[in-house]
């Protein structure tokens, strides 16, 4: 795959925040300076448990926008695209039955959130996008390019951030083709114990865990191969 910028979680957060700030910037007339179709989704590549979701939530909080997180491995073709149903249409005086799709669960959730909170802008964070099933992979690629699931587009004011695990942590990882990398702004996050420790203190990770990791620093980086892939 295409290599991005390698950085620790703190630097990654800054990078994401700067990009998000640019994407949310409006001109004097209240239009986004960078239109939705020009915004390349960020793709955060980093090991599980490094705090990807947490930094997205922090960035959203600091920018005063909403955030909606999904792990794409929990989604099926139906929940991403919407469910098919039969609609009746009239063409030239004759009635026909055609398939329509209900709204994508993910897109519907954005509208629900805007309705419930009154927040009009937000970050849609889709994790584990490189571990999706074969049937979801083409849908995901189309989404990354056009920001649509089925017939429904991500509403204006919502910015897409994606993340994935490196192949050594998950044997169901798909390699994106080079075309896909051109659509994404890739950020590679490296485990960095000292930065993680500072971050962990702030977020309240138990002191015993920190002490243990301080003594056994190797455990912080170690990946043990288990039967069903890497943990």
Show which residues each predicted segment covers.
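C-terminal regulatory/interaction module of P-loop NTP-utilizing enzymes
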Residues: 4-67, 72-124, 129-231
